[in-house]
Amino acid sequence: PLPYSSFYISDPKPRHIHKANIRDRVLHQAIFRVLYPIFDKTFIHDSYSSLVDKGTHAGVARLLDFLRKASANYQKPAFALKCDVSRFFDLIDHRILLELIARRIHDEHCLTLVRQIVESFSTAPGKGLPLGNVTSQLFANIYLNELDQFVKHSLKRHWCLRYCDDFVMVGSDREELHALIEPIRQFLDERFVRTL
């Protein structure tokens, strides 16, 4: 891969975008088209970032549905716990990401190309993905799919959705939602050496 060009946008906070050259973007698109159908079927239904037929509007509609259910059709209070994985793209661990991908992809040529894409950018040794690559969005979903599975299946939170590194859990009990912070923080720390 060739070096990235970079620029800043405000979305609403400043974000540093790294743009691959055209040749590398064609490769990223090809890798995305190979990996997406394999991993898409592993994601929870309520993951909304950069997925076909999902996105912000679908995520907001689903959140409103969760709030309606938690409030018994707006007859009682409902609460939402919004969490954000701290410095998510900057601190994605390359080794962990590549291990997660290798669980489903066994073709060595494909894995070599994926490794080259992942390792073409870093914010610290072995860490970070660039904002701006089509593959980065898919890699983010692959990386956080384990968190999604933990929240949905281990913590039994059915009214939960995620958009990239932000996720929201809805319920009718504020204290019950607040009590979820520590097990999620512990999961992130143990699995990814990360925090909320």
Q: What do these predicted regions represent?
A:
Residues 50-52:
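Basic, flexible linker segments flanking DNA-binding modules
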Residues 56, 60, 64:
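Duplex nucleic acid-engaging cores and interfaces of nucleic-acid transaction enzymes
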Residues 37, 41-46:
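Charged boundary/loop elements
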Residues 18-26, 105:
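Structural motif
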Residues 3, 46, 66-196:
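Conserved polymerase palm-domain catalytic core
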Residues 8-17, 125-131:
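Active-site flanking loop/helix segments enriched in acidic
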Residues 2-13, 40:
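A short glycine/small-residue-enriched secondary-structure motif
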